[in-house]
Amino acid sequence: MQRKVIVYIACSVDGYIAGPDDDLSFLSVVEQEGEDYGYAAFIQNIDTMIVGRKTYDKVQSMGLEYPPPGKMLYVITRSPKPDSGHVKFYSGGLAALVQKLKSEPGMHIYCDGGVEIVNQLLKLNLVDELIISVIPTLLGSGTQLFGSGLPVQKLTLVS
């Protein structure tokens, strides 16, 4: 199986992944007990995750188990830190990391954000799939998913 880099992320209708001050409360609009919107099935098909340091710090502050059990997490950072268990802090080039990971056997590679990492991957044409859950909310400001300067890329809507 050819490994894919998959961005799996939620955003508002107007394209924000967080409101002002990194507020994620808009995500609760669609929360339903027992519903994970396909996340559990998705996570079974990946064994590697890539995130930016800010995203890593945010998830850590929420007290969630991260990475999920059995997954390797690469945290892209400008300030190298010692690796810890299934967490590797990586300060090299993103293209080199993706090339290395894709050349190794394994399952798919999940990019969990943040926007800097997603946009770098898109600029380098390294994203194989975008899975975007659109939350029926207009935020008007905050952290935009897509930055300016991205190259034109033809996408195929799957569902």
Predicted features and spans:
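Enzymes that bind and transform nitrogen-containing heteroaromatic metabolites
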Residues: 1-159
